[in-house]
């Protein structure tokens, strides 16, 4: 989505939710703020902002009081229509720079770019490790009435009927983006409506448009509105799809870009995993039994590792596997050879019990390693931990 007539300015103040004072080309101007959220972390004195010159579209200007009353009516009705063609300001606030990141703060744009994106059939996201795409779209209807709410988008695609509630996200801290930045009972209501719509066969989505790029993950804002977090979590558990995409943002353009991880609860654990997993991948030891899912080989390694150093086990494990590669081989090997293969590990009763267990498997499970915890625990020499 492209904007026309963009100019750069610097934020001075915000007298109310609907207007801001911006320095543009050396003059202080009154600018329409297209986002009634708090945006306190964005609109700080001196911040570089980008505004749209709407002078060519205006047929008149409103007084300060008319503008405030009109904008308040728009906020209550949640409609995006203009107040006739009269306006008090020639400028609209579009984007703000926060550090090295440019953030689009136009609250009217997320619905538009999602609709545009769907029209181009670009929706591809990973859901439960399977690629899912909305294709074959035959209908897109904005502001769809469902129950007592208006859902942002209704989509028909082949035999699918899809409801999509779109939420713009501008609140960012250390690469983490959150919604909402202020309590929103309307957002909670919409999430509940989507959850109910599942029962009528609709496919439902909450689509978070991250109005910036380069973020790490999205999480609901527990501090600001815990009820929204709980509603979103319950909806997701019921089957509502919760997705987030970041955007490529320029001074005069915004477009949907890449999927962003959605963390609905315990973001601190996700943060920890982002540190520990890379460290583990780099520092972990290369152990042969970690390269297999064969339960027999894992079982042998578990018994060998009991009270024995890991590095010492590696060579014994390789020797044992070469001679006895499967349950059948272990069940039928002569005891002298078996004990010779175990030599150096000690605790010979362990390997004798292993052979007894292997013979149980041959008789009771036709040579196939049992699959359930209870079955495995019933084998000779296998306790709770090993099972």
List PLM regions with ranges.
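Conserved catalytic cores of phosphodiester-cleaving nucleases, focusing on short active-site segments
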Residues: 9, 151-180, 194
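A short acidic/basic microdomain associated with nuclease active sites
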Residues: 123-146
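Short nucleic-acid-contacting surface segments enriched for D/E, G, S/T with interspersed K/R
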Residues: 37-50
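Terminal, basic amphipathic appendages of nucleotide-handling enzymes
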Residues: 52-130
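Short aromatic-glycine-enriched beta-strand elements
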Residues: 16-21
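N-terminal polyanion-binding entry modules of DNA glycosylases/AP lyases
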Residues: 264-379, 385
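Nucleic-acid nuclease catalytic cores
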Residues: 167-168, 175-185, 192-224, 246
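Domain-level recognition of nuclease-like catalytic cores that cleave nucleotide substrates
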Residues: 211-267
């Amino acid at each position: 989505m492209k904007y026309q007539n963009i100019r750069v300015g610097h934020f001075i103040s915000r007298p109310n939710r609907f207007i801001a004072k911006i320095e543009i080309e050396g003059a202080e101007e009154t600018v329409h703020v297209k986002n009634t959220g708090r945006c306190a972390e964005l609109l700080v004195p001196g911040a570089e902002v980008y505004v749209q010159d709407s002078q060519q579209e205006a047929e008149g200007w409103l007084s300060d009081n008319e503008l405030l009353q009109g904008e308040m009516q728009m906020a209550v009705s949640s409609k995006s229509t203009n107040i006739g063609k009269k306006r008090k300001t020639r400028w609209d606030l579009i984007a703000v720079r926060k550090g090295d990141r440019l953030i689009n703060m136009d609250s009217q744009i997320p619905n538009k770019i999602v609709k545009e994106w769907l029209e181009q059939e670009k929706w591809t996201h990973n859901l439960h490790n399977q690629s899912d795409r909305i294709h074959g779209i035959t209908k897109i209807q904005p502001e769809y009435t469902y129950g007592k709410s208006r859902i942002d988008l209704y989509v028909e695609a082949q035999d699918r009927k899809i409801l999509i509630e779109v939420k713009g996200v501008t609140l960012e801290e250390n690469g983490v983006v959150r919604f909402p930045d202020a309590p929103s009972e309307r957002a909670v209501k919409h999430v509940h409506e989507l959850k109910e719509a599942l029962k009528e066969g609709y496919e439902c989505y909450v689509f978070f448009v991250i109005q910036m790029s380069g973020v790490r993950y999205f999480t609901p804002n527990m501090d600001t509105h815990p009820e929204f977090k709980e509603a979103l979590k319950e909806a997701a558990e019921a089957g509502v799809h919760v997705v987030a995409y970041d955007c490529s943002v320029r001074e005069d353009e915004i477009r949907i870009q890449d999927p962003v991880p959605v963390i609905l609860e315990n973001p601190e654990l996700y943060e920890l995993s982002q540190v520990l997993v890379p460290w583990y991948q780099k520092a972990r030891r290369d152990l042969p039994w970690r390269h297999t899912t064969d339960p027999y080989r894992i079982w042998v390694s578990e018994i060998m590792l009991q009270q024995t150093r890991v590095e010492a086990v590696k060579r014994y494990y390789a020797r044992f596997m070469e001679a006895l590669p499967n349950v059948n081989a272990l069940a039928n090997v002569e005891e002298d050879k078996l004990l010779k293969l175990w030599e150096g590990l000690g605790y010979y009763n362990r390997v004798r019990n292993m052979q007894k267990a292997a013979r149980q498997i041959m008789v009771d499970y036709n040579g196939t390693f049992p699959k359930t915890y209870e079955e495995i625990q019933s084998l000779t020499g296998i306790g709770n931990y090993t099972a």
